[in-house]
Swiss-Prot record:
Pathway: Purine metabolism; IMP biosynthesis via de novo pathway; 5-amino-1-(5-phospho-D-ribosyl)imidazole from N(2)-formyl-N(1)-(5-phospho-D-ribosyl)glycinamide: step 1/2. GO terms for biological process: 'de novo' IMP biosynthetic process. The lineage of its organism: Bacteria, Bacillati, Bacillota, Bacilli, Bacillales. Substrate binds at S99, H100, N101, H102, R121, Q245, E317, S318, Q319, S540. One of its GO terms (cellular component) is cytoplasm. It is found in: Cytoplasm. Mg(2+) 2 binds at D122, D273. Its EC number is 6.3.5.3. Keywords: ATP-binding, Cytoplasm, Ligase, Magnesium, Metal-binding, Nucleotide-binding, Purine biosynthesis. HAMAP family: PurL_2 (MF_00420). This is Phosphoribosylformylglycinamidine synthase subunit PurL. ATP binds at Y57, K96, D500, G537.
Length: 739
């Protein structure tokens, strides 16, 4: 589009062109009032992206304020590229999770790949070296050819980017439910390490300092990507492929090294990734956070397409680009540094005192807007909220235990449900050992990486059972945080903090907004109780296809500190003769369970209950026992219940099984999904010390029979399962469905 064809301010108003960009009538009137005149085409574009839900959180801010965001270890909470938590010895961990759902629904390979690239930039823009990646994925049922295609391409995109850039993808989760058929969820998380003195902020301080553009050149890809992410998917979304960016991991690898070297220089004042809304968000936010203004000369923007307009340059979401502010007079050092890595570094503006964002192109001023108006003054909406119609009905249901004829066959079938089955097909495509710091690889409760030069480790996980949250958003929200912490504890880590990715449907629907409010209430309560503040995250709304929303899916990414690598614990049995313990009571809780879904083909009723005081007490006891060296293996009891958890601990070992006795109604003790439960094994000589430290019931022992045998309280055999047969079924389920 050439400048001649852009509508003038009067046309923008009269023909409601602003509405096509995503602004409402009221918002356009606000823009007019802020500027004291009608905005031109470029200015309308700036407001439309910065005031989109994706950039401004205008529909979710009132809810997000409920999260606890401070703690004695928190060095940086929400508001910067990523959050930062102190881990002692002048070191800190930097982490964040973000969604790339809409792009991945349209162009799954590039959508997923650029999601990984974007989250990596958020972490190294803080000054940290990225050391690990995780992801949380949701798809429809694998029987559908379209879902198979999305699944295969998303995984390939994550692998393609992560492997090329040389950062290990160490963990995550994949779940399958029909509601994600048309709108998959792709949440990517990056974890980095930093020394305290290297922490950088995305702020443009110092009038007269120089604004520079570094990294890849700008094209027309991703224009209005932030607006695209703030609307529902529909049949016409396929036509929006141009809105999906294309990533170059090799360019990003060079960009990481160049930026980390730059951060060691005292020439750098501020640095920010050009993410959603590209140059617009990075310039407006850096100026606004510093209480300054910025002038930019768009003729100097490196462009890989001809005839780009100011509108296109400002709204492009081309990848692998950063905006930096450097001390005046030090520009040549920066150019030389980036040249060494084969990258462009171009002076394109300066910091001003008057808080305005001014853009010049071809010797003309093409936009003049207060930086705060873009970055901070988006309208905040308190959307109407209404309890979902299904909720009261589910709460009143009398829950019956699903009928199970053959316990062994049921266990075998559960192990083949894609949500429970081995994800080896997924993580075998990821290089999870690159950088040689990975101590616990994918497949256990949490991944663990070594903090080099110390005896410490970082445990990390992503968790969210969206079925529970659909049935009861508040309780489900508590469970998501509690399960993440349980996974960290089972790996020998002390839970530190969380990042979240709130994936929901259209917030303008009162029942969806109710889901958002309630799940955040539950998560906030759990974060306070477990002392894991929220240090950052992302909101992804409008996850709907043809009016049908996905399950509410507020994914939790949690990092924990392993104080000594001797404490690292995994889920698989270690040796025959070890004693098997179960911590926690089992109730007949089947709402949202894998068994319920498998037998009835749908979920209904009440989600499992959770008592956060009990959860905290058990986690503290288990962690103390692990740190005292009393625990051989630890596994949290999740999808599929105790029978699945015990079998998973046997599958991970070689040639080991277990004989256990479980009291209570058979279907419940085997397959119910009650919360706050662990399966722990302990050496026989540690029996007394362990039982003194932890409230647990010894249920049996690890055997070298390669069989899992479970008895009831009358000592009748409920099931005997050959571990090799179970492993084969569990490992083969996903590859079999993809054939």
């Amino acid at each position: 589009m050439s400048l001649m064809l852009e509508p003038n301010p009067t046309q923008i108003k009269e023909e409601r062109i602003y509405a096509e960009m995503g602004l409402t009538d009221e918002e356009f009137a606000m823009v007019e009032k802020i500027l004291g005149r009608l905005p031109n085409y470029t200015e309308t574009g700036l407001f439309s992206v910065m005031w989109s839900e994706h950039c401004s959180y205008k529909n979710s801010k009132p809810v997000l304020r409920k999260f606890p965001t401070t703690g004695e270890r928190v060095l940086q909470g929400p508001g910067e590229g990523a959050g930062i938590v102190d881990i002692g010895d002048n070191q800190a961990v930097v982490f964040k999770m973000e969604s790339h759902n809409h792009p991945s629904a349209i162009e799954p390979y590039q959508g997923a790949a650029t999601g990984v690239g974007g989250i990596i930039r958020d972490v190294f823009s803080m000054g940290a070296r990225p050391v690990a990646l995780l992801n949380s994925l949701r798809f429809g049922e694998l029987q559908s050819p379209r879902v198979k295609y999305l699944f295969e391409e998303v995984v390939a995109g994550i692998a393609g980017y992560g492997n090329c850039i040389g950062i290990p993808t160490v963990g995550g989760e994949v779940q399958f439910d029909p509601c994600y058929e048309g709108n998959p969820l792709v949440n990517a998380m990056c974890v980095g390490l930093i020394n305290h003195e290297d922490i950088k902020k995305g702020q443009a301080h110092g009038a007269g300092n120089t604004v520079m553009y570094v990294g890849a050149s700008t094209g027309r890809d991703g224009i209005h990507g932030a607006t695209f992410a703030s609307e529902e998917l529909s049949e016409s979304s396929e036509a929006k492929r141009p809105a999906v960016q294309v990533g170059d991991p090799f360019m990003e690898k060079l960009l990481i090294e160049a930026c980390l070297e730059l951060i060691q220089s005292d020439a750098l004042v501020g640095i920010q990734d050009m993410g959603a809304a590209g140059l617009t968000s990075s310039s407006a936010e850096m100026a606004s956070k510093a209480g300054m203004g910025i002038e930019m000369y768009l003729d100097d923007v490196p462009q890989r397409e001809t005839g780009m307009t100011p509108y296109e340059m400002m709204l492009s979401e081309s990848q692998e680009r950063m905006l930096i502010v450097v001390k005046k007079g030090r520009e040549q050092e920066i150019v030389d540094l980036f040249e060494k890595y084969g990258l462009a570094a171009v002076t394109m503006g300066k910091v001003t005192e008057d808080k305005m964002l001014r853009l010049f192109h071809k010797d003309e001023m093409v936009a003049e807007v207060p930086a705060d108006a873009l970055a901070e003054e988006a309208p905040i909406y308190h959307k109407p909220s209404k309890e979902a119609a299904y909720f009261a009905e589910f709460q009143q249901m009398k829950m019956e235990t699903p009928k199970v004829e053959d316990y062994k066959e049921t266990l075998l079938a559960l192990l083949q449900q894609p949500t429970i089955a081995s994800k080896e097909w997924v993580y075998d495509q990821y290089d999870y050992q690159v950088r040689t710091s990975t101590i616990v690889t994918p497949g256990s409760d949490a991944a663990v990486i070594r903090v080099r030069g110390t005896e410490k480790g970082l445990a990390m996980t992503t968790d969210c059972n969206s079925r529970y949250i659909y049935l009861d958003p508040e309780v489900g929200g508590k469970i998501a945080v509690a399960e993440a912490a349980r996974n960290i504890v089972c790996s020998g880590g002390e839970p530190l903090a969380i990042t979240d990715c709130l994936n929901f449907g259209n917030p303008e629907k009162p029942e969806i907004f109710w889901q958002i409010e309630k799940s955040v209430d539950g998560m906030s309560e759990a974060c306070r109780k477990l002392q894991t503040p929220v240090i950052g995250g992302n909101v992804s709304m409008y996850n709907e296809r043809s009016g049908e929303a996905v399950y509410p899916t507020p994914t939790v990414g949690m990092v924990g500190l392993v104080h000594d690598l001797k404490h690292v614990t995994t889920q698989e049995f270690k040796q025959a003769g070890d004693l098997v313990y179960v911590i926690g009571e089992t109730k007949a809780e089947f709402g949202g369970s894998e068994l319920q879904k498998m037998i009835y083909g749908k979920i209904f009723g009440q989600s499992p209950s959770i008592d956060l005081d009990v959860e905290l007490k058990r986690q503290k006891q288990v962690l103390a026992a692990i740190q005292a060296g009393l625990v051989q293996s630890a596994h949290d009891v999740a999808e599929g219940g105790l029978a699945v958890a015990i079998t998973e601990s046997a599958i991970g070992a070689k040639g080991l099984g277990a004989t256990v006795k479980l009291d209570g109604e058979a279907t419940a003790v085997l397959f119910a999904e009650s919360q706050s439960r662990f399966v722990i094994t302990v050496k026989r000589e540690n029996k007394e010390a362990f039982e003194k430290a932890v409230e647990a019931i010894q249920v049996g022992e690890v055997t070298n029979t390669n069989e899992v045998t479970i008895h009831n309280e009358e000592n009748e055999v409920l099931l005997t399962a050959n571990v090799d047969e179970m492993r084969k079924a569990w490992k083969g389920a996903i590859p079999c469905l993809l054939k």
